Amino acid sequence: LDIGVGKDAKGSMKIREFLRKHPEYAGGTIGVVALDARGVLCAATSTGGVTLKLPGRVGDTPLPGAGTYANKFAASSATGTGEYVIRSLSCRAISEGVERGKSLDDSVTEMLAQMTRDFDADVGFIAIDANGHAVANHSTAHMPHAFFKDDSKIVARMFVEKA
């Protein structure tokens, strides 16, 4: 496969076409964000795997601020094209937006819009703020996610309108 990076690269299109024809090769990122009873925010992300990745490639998942980030204002996890998530340090930017006074919804929505504008990237985010407000938003075709608070009913969603 011809794999390229950048707004004009055709590599990601070829990968998407390949995965549409061969969904058995698709992997998925798993992200978790939480606010515990003491008010501590945390985030964790598991990579979608190494299928169709270049040898030696380091994705966004292990890089704090890129695919995973938490501070006292917000915690978030990203999924999508890792190179774009790395370039934007998207999860850190979401927390910094909340720290500057933006709502979590606005911070996530603005980061998603920026990544779509700058990279035409297929990405998604889950995030939670220090008040326990959770957000999931994406530009991918789908991003299954679920959330609950205390003893509340678990809410699970498979499809959400694209931003």
Task: For each feature predicted by the language model, list its residue ranges.
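N-terminal nucleophile
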Residues: 1-163
